[in-house]
């Protein structure tokens, strides 16, 4: 086998491989002989079909199969000999073959050589937060509001009330599509409507008719309404005030707490909030570390890996919307290109961190991750057993653990400053509510 390597552009490589033609002919003849023994052709006894007949009927297909096998086998031997690391499947094209040699060209991309830099320049503001008694009380108040009942109130509407309204919206005196409703129920303070709408209802009583002036946000989804001033004619038909449940043993039972009453409920709430806080703190630091790593290391990305990641994201998008990929038009690659490129780049860089620091997955960490995730379920032991019995899920958790270890390794060389933050403020930002 003779091999020549050519760098065409970027990460693309072209291997020209030639092997003795007799290798092809030998394998073709062996395959034809095997086919002759089992061929069933009218006019000939089994095993007695002349080779010329077998060759005429099956020769082209057999030669194609043999050629494919020869190319694949010699390609693997060539990349091992040349110490190349393909980042995707090759494409094979025939070369300048003759009676003495069979030549083909394999074109493919290789993984980039990653040399990490700027790790000591990564800046991380590490948030520090705790779940306080006030945070637990605030969560209980939220739960009370979620389980409130509503009764008609003979007073003016205020924050937290539910109102039932009829409304008609207009821009420049013209009604617009989607701007009209009857019997529409709205909780004041929910933020469901555009700015100023809910505020304009406060202070009015059932039976009143009035108008409010608002402006649609510039980022509003309807193109024809972005930034437009609008007027809404409103009829307020009902005002319903919230009745919050008392915090007692019966309230605790609503959340599955049958023993220990309110104190047990508070303990359970604190445990859940602490778990969510820990996850959010980790995610915040990880994002900062990854962003710093990406900013300091610009590497060329194999198109094959990006295309593969786009396909994964495309399938996930279809699944999220409950669709069947076979029955849906293919979502354009542009929708996922930026995210795919980031994921590929992060994967390559973290892979180099793991390699250069010789990290090995910590099984104790894997089990801790599974236990933390399982604690959110009704029967944690059952979830833990299920994960430990599923090879694919366990491999996923090992990957998560190893990625955590890589981030921690990067954190050791980063410039880290700590910042005390309040639970509510931090969690609101983490969940996009701020």
Swiss-Prot record:
Q: Kindly state which keywords UniProt assigns to this record, in alphabetical order.
A: Cell cycle, Cell division, Chaperone, Cytoplasm, Isomerase, Rotamase
Annotated PPIase FKBP-type domain ranges read: 160-245
Highest rank taxon of the organism: Bacteria
This enzyme catalyses:
[protein]-peptidylproline (omega=180) = [protein]-peptidylproline (omega=0)
Read off the Pfam families from this record. Answer: FKBP_C, Trigger_C, Trigger_N
Q: Name one GO biological process term.
A: protein transport
Taking the first listed entry, what is the main subcellular location of this protein, grouped into a coarse class? cytoplasm
Enzyme Commission numbers on file: 5.2.1.8
Report a single Gene Ontology molecular function: protein folding chaperone
Where it sits in the cell: the answer is: Cytoplasm
> Which Gene Ontology CC terms are recorded?
cytoplasm
EC primary class: isomerase
Q: What does this protein do?
A: Involved in protein export. Acts as a chaperone by maintaining the newly synthesized protein in an open conformation. Functions as a peptidyl-prolyl cis-trans isomerase.
- Name the family: Belongs to the FKBP-type PPIase family. Tig subfamily.
Free-text note on domains in this protein's UniProt record: Consists of 3 domains; the N-terminus binds the ribosome, the middle domain has PPIase activity, while the C-terminus has intrinsic chaperone activity on its own.
Q: Which NCBIfam families match?
A: tig
Report the protein name in the record: Trigger factor
**Gene for this protein?**
tig
């Amino acid at each position: 086998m003779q091999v020549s390597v050519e760098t065409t552009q970027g990460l693309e490589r072209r291997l020209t491989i030639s092997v003795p033609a007799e290798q092809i002919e030998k394998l073709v003849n062996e395959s034809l002989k095997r086919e002759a023994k089992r061929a069933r052709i009218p006019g000939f006894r089994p095993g007695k079909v002349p080779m010329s007949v077998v060759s005429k009927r099956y020769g082209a297909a057999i030669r194609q199969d043999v050629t494919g096998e020869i190319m694949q086998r010699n390609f693997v031997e060539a990349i091992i000999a040349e110490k190349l690391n393909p980042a995707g499947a090759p494409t094979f094209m025939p070369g300048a073959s003759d009676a003495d040699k069979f030549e083909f060209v394999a074109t493919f991309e290789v993984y980039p050589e990653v040399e990490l830099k700027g790790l000591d320049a990564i800046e991380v503001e590490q948030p520090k937060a705790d779940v306080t008694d006030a945070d637990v009380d605030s969560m209980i108040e939220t739960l009370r509001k979620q389980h409130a009942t509503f009764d008609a109130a003979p007073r003016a509407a205020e924050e937290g009330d539910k109102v039932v309204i009829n409304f008609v919206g207009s821009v420049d005196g013209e009604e617009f599509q989607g701007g009209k409703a009857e019997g529409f129920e709205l909780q004041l303070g929910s933020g469901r409507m555009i700015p100023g709408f809910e505020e304009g209802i406060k202070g009015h009583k059932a039976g009143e008719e009035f108008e409010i002036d608002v402006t649609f946000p510039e980022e509003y989804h309807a193109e024809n309404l972005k930034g437009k001033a609008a007027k809404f004619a409103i009829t307020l038909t009902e005002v319903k005030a919230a009745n919050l449940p008392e915090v007692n043993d019966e309230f605790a039972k609503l959340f599955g707490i049958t023993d220990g009453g309110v104190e047990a409920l508070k303990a359970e709430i604190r445990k859940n909030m602490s778990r969510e806080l820990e996850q959010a703190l980790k995610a915040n630091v990880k994002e900062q570390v990854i962003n710093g790593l990406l900013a300091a290391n610009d590497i060329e990305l194999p198109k094959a890996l990006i295309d593969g990641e786009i396909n994964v994201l495309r399938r996930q998008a279809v699944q999220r919307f409950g669709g069947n990929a076979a029955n849906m038009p293919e979502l354009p690659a542009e929708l996922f290109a930026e995210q795919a490129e980031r994921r590929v780049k992060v994967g390559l860089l973290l892979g180099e961190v793991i390699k250069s620091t010789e990290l090995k997955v910590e099984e104790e960490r894997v089990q801790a991750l599974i236990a933390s995730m399982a604690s959110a379920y009704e029967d944690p032991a059952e979830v833990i057993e299920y994960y430990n019995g599923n090879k694919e899920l366990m491999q996923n958790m090992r990957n998560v653990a190893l990625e955590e270890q890589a981030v921690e390794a990067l954190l050791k060389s980063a410039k880290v400053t700590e910042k005390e933050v309040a639970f509510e403020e931090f969690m609101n930002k983490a969940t996009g509510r701020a």
